[in-house]
């Protein structure tokens, strides 16, 4: 089976490799061509124009930065989607997903959303959580392909529902870490043994695994290996902030986290791992 895969960044590349491992014929496009080199060495077909990459395959998967990038790549040359299925896997707003559905269907194609939750390591090992928005018939037909990315493939509901759920979950990522970073900064400033702090935290209902995962980065202030770049986290929080405003959800907590991320970007931490927000919460003396 031929699959077009558009977007081979931090998450897209390991996800594309999962499809190659499953012996699918992969037709790849990325706006930065150098990010396709490893896939090319493993027999993926590389294209310099998205319309060429999607010409033959009946199934198209996008893992691009945001809605604007998706629109630019898919529609810049009036590509024909007749008889094709598009699986959109990026984190975008529900309304943006519905707009894509409308445009793809107007062109004779089929659209589903399938955002994922997990790290680059989980993308490599095929342990992502895949949230799917489409009708039941389409979900059952495409579930086998989506299981290449993770065994947990969940039908959330119609298009828009999975995108909304992804935003709800992504809101927790910087919120949890900001709270942890704040407590960690206070513990350090008070001269309390960090090992004691972590020992008690791990034994409590307050603990989240991400605390231990990001603790070494924070203590060393080493954020160069970006599992999730801070600029992308801010992109998601901006979407979440807008969605909460539009859906009668108090935004005070999100505003605080958003301000921390904005300050992080202004401190030239955009391309660092999002745990670099620690530098804003606990500035170096």
Mark where each language-model region is:
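Rossmann-fold dinucleotide-binding core
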Residues: 92-171
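Hydrophobic beta-strand scaffold residues
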Residues: 26, 46, 111-112, 153, ...
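Helical "substrate-binding/catalytic lid" subdomain
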Residues: 161-284
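Rossmann-like NAD(P)(H) cofactor-binding subdomain of soluble oxidoreductases
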Residues: 48-55, 59-61, 66-128
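Hydrophobic residues within alpha-helices
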Residues: 15-16, 35, 100, 145, ...
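NAD(P)+-binding Rossmann beta1-loop-alpha1 motif at the extreme N-terminus of oxidoreductases
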Residues: 1-63, 82-85, 120
């Amino acid at each position: 089976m031929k699959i077009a895969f558009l977007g081979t960044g931090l998450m897209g590349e390991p996800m594309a490799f999962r499809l190659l491992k499953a012996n699918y014929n992969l037709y790849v496009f990325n706006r930065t061509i150098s990010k396709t080199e490893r896939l090319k060495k493993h027999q993926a077909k590389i294209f310099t124009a998205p319309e060429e990459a999607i010409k033959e395959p009946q199934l198209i998967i996008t893992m691009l930065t945001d809605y604007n990038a998706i629109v630019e790549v898919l529609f810049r040359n009036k590509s024909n989607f007749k008889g094709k299925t598009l699986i959109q896997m990026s984190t975008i707003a529900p309304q943006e997903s519905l707009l894509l559905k409308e445009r793809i269907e107007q062109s004779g194609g089929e659209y589903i959303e399938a955002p994922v939750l997990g790290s680059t390591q989980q993308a490599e090992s095929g342990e992502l959580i895949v949230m799917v928005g489409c009708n039941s018939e389409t979900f059952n037909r495409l579930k086998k392909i989506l299981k290449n990315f993770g065994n947990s493939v969940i039908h959330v509901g119609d298009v828009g529902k999975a995108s909304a759920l992804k935003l709800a979950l992504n809101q927790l990522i910087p919120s949890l870490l900001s709270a942890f970073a704040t407590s960690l900064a206070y513990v350090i400033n008070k001269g309390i043994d960090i090992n004691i702090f972590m020992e008690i935290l791990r034994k409590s209902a307050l603990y989240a695994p991400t605390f231990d995962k990001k603790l070494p980065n924070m203590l060393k202030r080493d954020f160069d290996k970006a599992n999730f770049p801070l600029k992308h986290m801010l992109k998601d929080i901006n979407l979440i902030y807008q969605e909460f405003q539009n859906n009668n959800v108090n935004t005070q907590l999100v505003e605080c986290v958003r301000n921390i991320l904005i300050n992080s970007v202004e401190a030239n931490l955009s391309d660092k791992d999002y745990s670099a927000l620690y530098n804003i919460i606990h500035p170096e003396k």
